[in-house]
């Protein structure tokens, strides 16, 4: 199964509380921090809601 590398490219400060919560739950703390998450519907949904704050790369196993 493919995985996604998610990088926070813009700050979550001054954003809606829901968007800040999503950033925190994905494990992103600071600008330019990255996490690797499984490519599933839940992760894709979270990325969709904060797509203007993150960049996503697909990592193939």
From Swiss-Prot:
Could you confirm whether the keyword Plastid appears in this record? no
Extract the InterPro entries matched here. Answer: Ribo_uL30_ferredoxin-like_sf, Ribosomal_uL30_bac-type, Ribosomal_uL30_ferredoxin-like
Which Gene3D superfamilies does the record cross-reference, listed alphabetically?
Ribosomal protein L30, ferredoxin-like fold domain
Keyword check for Ribosomal protein, yes or no: yes
The record's GO CC annotations read:
large ribosomal subunit
Name the family the entry cites.
Answer: Belongs to the universal ribosomal protein uL30 family.
Subunit field text: Part of the 50S ribosomal subunit.
Name the record gives this protein: Large ribosomal subunit protein uL30
